């Protein structure tokens, strides 16, 4: 059965299908999503939600905030997650004692994450790393809802952490995740790009916020055994990307 307009050649047909595949695949997405949920192994969040590295008179604090990425899902200990990796890099760069804290929950969407904003934890933070948006895209939230929810969340974080630089992790290219079969991967990739663009716009509209891309090469070594969450290698890459951004901004206080 023809699924593209008559009168187009093979190359044009391929381009047409790539543009329209997410819409064509939407009816299959719920069934495939259920299959993935049953198939993907359940793993644990990392231990060590607080910790300290480095030495020196200077004191810095990094907070990992948001969803399963920052909760360290599929990582043994937060020493190896983005929280610990950032703390170690900050300690080395600034010859400081750096503490980390984690305010994150697996499965959190932007509205759920609002309940994780804890002024007692965030008030003295120097750097806050935020991962949010994948679950909003996965759970079928509308773009208008996500824009509203993530804007409210960013404002709450900035208010609770008056001196912190806040870094958002971009929504990764979900179409490349090993755990997602096609056409579900194409649907998720399409939604992920839309939600990523919203996050980018909301970051640009606020002071003290920056963002790192999550669209680098994603080989098998970048994923945990579930094929969905980041491995220790990818957590380290996130931390390296943040440190590159910090090179371009005023030194942490």
Tell where the protein language model's regions lie, with residue ranges.
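N-terminal secretory targeting modules
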Residues: 1-63, 247-253
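Extracellular glycan-modifying ectodomains
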Residues: 2-13, 112-116, 135, 174
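Short charge-dense sequence patches
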Residues: 30-43, 60-67, 97-108, 145-154, ...
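Conserved SGNH/GDSL esterase-like catalytic core that processes O-acyl groups on lipids
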Residues: 61-63, 69-149
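Alpha-helical cap/lid subdomain in secreted, periplasmic
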Residues: 115-253
């Amino acid at each position: 059965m023809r699924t593209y307009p008559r009168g187009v050649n093979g190359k044009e047909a391929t381009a047409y299908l790539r543009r329209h595949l997410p819409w064509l695949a939407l009816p299959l997405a719920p069934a495939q999503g259920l299959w993935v949920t049953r198939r993907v192994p359940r793993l644990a969040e990392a231990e060590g939600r607080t910790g300290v590295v480095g030495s020196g008179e200077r004191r810095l604090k990094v907070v990992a905030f948001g969803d399963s990425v920052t909760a360290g899902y599929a990582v043994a200990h937060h020493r190896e997650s983005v929280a610990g990796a950032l703390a170690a890099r900050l300690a080395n760069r600034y010859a400081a004692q750096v503490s980390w804290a984690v305010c994150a929950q697996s499965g959190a969407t932007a509205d759920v994450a609002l309940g994780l904003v804890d002024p007692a934890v965030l008030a003295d933070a120097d750097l806050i790393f935020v991962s949010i948006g994948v679950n909003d895209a996965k759970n079928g939230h509308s773009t208008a809802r996500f824009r509203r929810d993530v804007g409210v969340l960013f404002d709450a974080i900035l208010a609770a952490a008056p001196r912190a630089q806040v870094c958002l992790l971009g929504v990764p290219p979900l179409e490349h995740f090993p755990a997602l079969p096609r056409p579900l991967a194409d649907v998720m990739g399409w939604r992920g790009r839309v939600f990523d663009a919203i996050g980018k716009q909301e970051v640009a509209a606020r002071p003290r916020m920056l963002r790192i891309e999550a669209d680098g090469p994603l080989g098998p070594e970048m994923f945990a055994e579930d094929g969905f969450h980041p491995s220790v290698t990818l957590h380290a890459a996130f931390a390296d990307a943040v440190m590159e951004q910090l090179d371009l901004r005023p030194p942490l206080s």
